[in-house]
Every structure is written in C-alpha cells, then in structure tokens.
C-alpha cells in the first residue's frame, strides 16, 4: 500500500521493577502504598464503621455515598492544583488536611450525624484524589517507554496497601471500637506527612516540571494556519531565487 505516512513505531516498554520504581520516585512509591492502606480501610470498612456507631441502614448508605461522591467531585480541582504547583507540596497539604479531618471525626463525630458527614466528606475530598497526584508525580520522572511498566508496578504497590489496610485496621476497630478506623487513618497520615515533608526538603524536582510555568498542550500535527504560513514562505523564497 502506497502512502506518505510512515509506519508506526513499535517499541518494547522498559521494565520497571519495585526497586527501580522507588529509585525513580520514593515519594510515589511510599505515597501509593500508604494511600492504598487508607483506601482498603476507609472504603472497605466505612459501612462497618457506621454499623458499629448504631446508624440506621439509610444513614449508612448516606455515609458511604458521601465517602465516595465527595472525593470524586474533588478529582479535577486537586488535579488542577497539582499541575500548577509542586506536586509534593500538594501531597503534603492533602496529608495534613486528611490527618486533621480524621482527628475531627474522632473528636466531633459523635456530636451529630451531620457533623460526622461533614468531616468524612472532607476526608474523602482529599484522600480520593491522592493516588492520581501520586501517579502524575511519578510520570514527571519517567521516559515514554517507562510509563506503562511503571504504572503497572505502582498499581501493584497500591494493591499491596489495599490488601494490608483492612487486616490492620480490624485490630484498631477491635480495640478502639468504631473510631479505631480513623485512629488508624490518622497514624498512617502522620507517617505519610513526615515522609512527604522530608521529600520536599531533600527530594529532586523533575527537569520537565516548572511550578512557575503553566502547562501547555502542543498539537502533534501542524495547524492549517501554520501550514499555510509555511507554504507562503517557501513560495516567496523560490520567487526570490528565480
């Protein structure tokens, strides 16, 4: 088949092991594992949390809805902020807000159901977009042929946290009753916040990322105006030579 277009390039993706992943971005590695432990606990046992508080079935369904829907709503604004500022700073802020909201659930959650929903919603708003920011931070340090393998390895790390989270938090909920869920979350956020703060101080910044420069999408093909301008310039040069 005759065509002016070149054949697509087929290249084998570079394999990224767990060691390579941590070497590329310790923040992404620990962040994915830590937030996986949070997801496995908070999203897996939030209904159990409500049941142990003595909530009705309808109240538990509202609690589960808020815990999921509010986080989904904040995916875009948090992502926009992470594209504007240093992603490590955004991750640190998310950690701090999640830590404070977890403590507030423990202290004020028993006051009323509406207050409980408020702080669970705040926790969801900052915890659910966390993993997306972690992935974006990792991609800042990768070559094109590393993205697929690194993403799959990061998913594995996150899945390990998802598996361990419910197992560990069950012990907390057995000892501290319902609020053991958020005692557990608070402890995980403390470690994540400390590690993130350490990476902010000593970690490297991606060469392709400049927090003071807004991102710009560049088309892979030339626009019609650009093609017309280039054509006119070529014609004028030919006329000059003649």
Which role fits each region the language model picked out?
Residues 171-189:
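A membrane-interface helix-boundary motif in multi-pass transporters
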Residues 1-10, 192-200:
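C-terminal membrane-cytosol helix-exit motif in multi-pass small-molecule transporters
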Residues 57, 142-154:
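Loop-to-transmembrane helix entry/capping segments in MFS-fold secondary transporters
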Residues 22-41, 121, 125:
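Pair of pore-lining "gating" transmembrane helices in MFS-fold secondary transporters
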Residues 128-142:
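Intracellular juxtamembrane helix-capping segments at the cytosolic ends
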Residues 89-104, 186:
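Structural signature of the two symmetry-related core transmembrane helices
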Residues 75-86, 173-174:
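Helix-to-loop junctions at the C-terminal end of transmembrane segments
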Residues 10-13, 199-242:
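Intrinsic disorder in cytosolic terminal tails and internal cytosolic loops
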